[in-house]
A protein has these predicted regions:
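Active-site-adjacent beta->alpha loops and helix N-cap segments on the catalytic face
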Residues: 1-15, 29-34, 51-71, 88-92, ...
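Catalytic cores of alpha/beta
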Residues: 28-39, 81, 85-104
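Short beta-strand/loop segments at the ligand-binding rim of alpha/beta enzyme cores
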Residues: 14-24, 73-82
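Alpha-helix C-cap/termination motif
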Residues: 17-18, 38, 73-74, 97, ...
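Charged C-terminal helix
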Residues: 124
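Flexible, glycine/proline-enriched loop segments at strand-loop-helix junctions
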Residues: 19-21, 57, 105
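Non-cysteine beta-strand/loop elements that form the S-adenosyl-L-methionine
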Residues: 41-48
């Protein structure tokens, strides 16, 4: 259920009837499957790094395993890689894994984070 008490389906349907393009921010392959079943126009891996640590060993970089699985399962659905894209190499890896597009956020909008990444790498 949504904060307004509606099912996602009940929110999505009227928007689709009006021709609105819909993107689903997803955490898991199950989320992507559900978005596909509901007819979302595209999905992103934005929330994949929000999984509990026990479910993922991802610490850095985009969730390429989820991206690859989604691209394989849904070859006609645009999959956007979003989240933890810190370097041009991360973006290239996402495109090579089949991403339809890549979103670079914090790496270009938050200098404090970028500085901490460099410091951590140099302290190793």
């Amino acid at each position: 259920h949504r904060p307004d008490g509606k099912l996602l389906e009940d929110t999505v349907r009227p928007l689709q009837e009006e021709g609105v393009l819909l993107m689903a921010d997803c955490m898991t392959i199950e989320d992507i499957r559900h978005a596909y079943e509901l007819g979302f126009d595209l999905v992103s891996t934005t929330l994949s790094h929000n999984k509990p640590a026990i479910e993922t060993s991802l610490n850095e970089g985009p969730d390429l395993p989820l991206l690859r699985q989604a691209v394989e399962e849904f070859p006609d659905l645009p999959i956007i890689c979003e989240g933890h894209v810190h370097t041009p190499q991360d973006a290239r890896a996402a495109l090579d894994a089949g991403a339809w597009a890549v979103v670079v956020g914090t790496a270009i909008t938050h200098p404090t984070s970028v500085t901490s990444w460099f410091k951590a790498a140099l302290d190793e």
